[in-house]
């Protein structure tokens, strides 16, 4: 049984701080995208009352601690961590922000973003704040290895953008 808090720490030799280069690939790792969390960043700034629960349900992200723990294990893997040039979690703003902050110029293919269910439109895919997802930038030649290592932790990993 595991209990406690998570502290984000890694040996310095496992961390790279590099500017993504032309041709690098952004891989989305972890949970699938759904309608949960759409508008969460703006929803947290609104005034709320007793009726808010009826209208704001989609703004609330639905966590998945099992997937979160798998992501933690993956990032502790030195072989994986050394491939990552830059990464970002999916907080406020979803794909737009998490991937958009990684490089100055990106080509994002929303059709490749893994979905929890069908019927999501482009805006929902772009702004969903579904949790337990990370966007990582790796060199094109490291994509297959990154996907394989994620798979060893039972995590989905999908290339969704290029620099």
Regions found by a protein language model. Give the residues of each.
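Glycine/proline-enriched, intrinsically flexible loops and inter-domain linkers
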Residues: 1-163
């Amino acid at each position: 049984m595991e209990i406690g808090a998570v502290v984000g720490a890694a040996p310095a030799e496992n961390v790279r701080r590099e500017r993504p280069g032309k041709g690098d690939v952004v891989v989305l790792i972890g949970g699938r995208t759904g309608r949960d969390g759409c508008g969460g960043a703006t929803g947290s700034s609104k005034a709320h009352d007793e009726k808010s629960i009826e209208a704001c349900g989609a703004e609330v992200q639905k966590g998945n601690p099992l997937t979160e723990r798998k992501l933690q294990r993956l990032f502790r893997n030195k072989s994986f961590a050394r491939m990552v040039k830059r990464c970002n979690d999916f907080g406020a703003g979803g794909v737009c922000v998490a991937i958009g902050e990684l490089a100055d110029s990106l080509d994002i293919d929303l059709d490749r973003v893994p979905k929890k269910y069908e019927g999501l439109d482009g805006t929902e895919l772009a702004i969903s704040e579904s949790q337990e997802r990370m966007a990582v930038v790796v060199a094109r030649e490291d994509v297959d290895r990154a996907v394989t290592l994620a798979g060893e932790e039972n995590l989905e990993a999908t290339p969704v953008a290029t620099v």
